[in-house]
């Protein structure tokens, strides 16, 4: 699973996920991308499931870029634990994904294969997504 090697502080507050993404709203590396249409947390397990489904669909051809990384720790208290006694232990890691962010990119394969791989990846995610294509500055593909 993806997780940071080390962090300055083990635990974080939950925060809010509002607004649009500040960057990464265009496809930069590949030819096709999977864009988030809602804001949400994406867990490390969900990212890995998407990666595996894309790798199996592409069958060792083309390239995959993952543009999100789970760097936010999520804590939870044990079942049957009473209130108080401090914050719970770190249970997993999530990536904060805002609306409009391109999460995954694929390049080096034909259009049908890329779309099929991104559709499989989108089915593993808890948010609505859209498949987007890369546009050059001149307006041509």
From Swiss-Prot:
GO terms for cellular component: cytosolic large ribosomal subunit. Keywords: Ribonucleoprotein, Ribosomal protein, RNA-binding, rRNA-binding, tRNA-binding. The keyword Cytoplasm does not apply. The keyword Nucleus does not apply. GO terms for molecular function: rRNA binding; structural constituent of ribosome; tRNA binding. It holds the Pfam family Ribosomal_L16. Gene3D superfamilies: Ribosomal protein L10e/L16. Coiled coil: none annotated. GO terms for biological process: translation. It comes from the Bacteria. Part of the 50S ribosomal subunit. Binds 23S rRNA and is also seen to make contacts with the A and possibly P site tRNAs. Belongs to the universal ribosomal protein uL16 family. This is Large ribosomal subunit protein uL16. The gene is rplP.
């Amino acid at each position: 699973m993806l997780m940071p090697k080390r962090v300055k502080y083990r635990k974080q507050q939950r925060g809010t996920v509002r607004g649009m993404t500040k960057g990464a709203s265009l496809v930069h590396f590949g030819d096709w991308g999977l864009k988030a249409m809602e804001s949400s947390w994406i867990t490390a397990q969900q990212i890995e499931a998407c990666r595996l489904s894309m790798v199996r669909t592409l069958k060792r051809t083309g390239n995959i870029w993952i543009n999100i990384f789970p760097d936010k720790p999520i804590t939870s208290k044990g079942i049957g634990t009473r209130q108080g006694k401090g914050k719970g232990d770190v249970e997993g890691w999530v990536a904060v994904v805002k609306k409009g962010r391109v999460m995954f990119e694929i390049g080096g394969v034909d259009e049908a294969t890329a779309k099929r791989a991104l559709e499989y990846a989108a089915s593993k995610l808890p948010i609505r997504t859209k498949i987007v294509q890369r546009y050059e500055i001149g307006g041509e593909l």
